[in-house]
Amino acid sequence: MKVVVDNSILKFKELIPHLSDLKDIDFYHLHTEEIINNSIKDAEILFVRSTLKINADLINNTKIKFVGSATAGFDHIDVKYLENNNINWCYSPGCNSSSVVHYVISSINFLIEKKLFNLNDCVGIVGYGNIGSKLRKALNKVGIKNICYDPFLKLEHLKNFDEIKQCKLLSFHVPL
């Protein structure tokens, strides 16, 4: 079996030696720009990042049976095409959520240092999924007031939109 892996997926090469039972699998590591229809003709599995568009132009007339994306989103994947062609796929929701939370907390710290935000101000969190819920926990741990809003979830602590508009800082964690 031939597996094509985007070179930009960190640590993938380090994982392969630990898969000793996979002797009949050949891994080919290509740079993103090298992953084109002709270079994956004989591959059955494809692992990518969000910089590569997964669509008919790439997959047509190949042996691809599975596409795995090492990214939190899947807007680079033509899901209908894959499903219509019985190609399984997956992505990695939440894989970068901790990094995003750290970034937001660091940004708030920067704003505090510049006296643009203080600990008595309130942060509004729009979207209460993987990232929004982790951000709320982190803000609570450091004692920063916050209000969450997510119109798709009916949880008690998710306030109405009018209340969140009063926050000094808004952090959006919603699909684009």
How should these model regions be labeled?
Residues E44-L116:
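Phosphate/diphosphate ligand-binding glycine-rich loop within oxidoreductases
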Residues T32-I36, K53-N55, I77, K159:
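Short acidic active-site motifs
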Residues K53-L58, F152-L176:
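Rossmann-like adenosine-cofactor binding region
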Residues L119-N140:
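Glycine-rich adenosine-cofactor-binding loop
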Residues K141-H157:
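NAD(P)-binding Rossmann-fold cofactor-contacting core
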Residues N7, S50, T71, F172-V174:
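Glycine-rich, N-terminal phosphate-binding loop of Rossmann-like dinucleotide-binding domains
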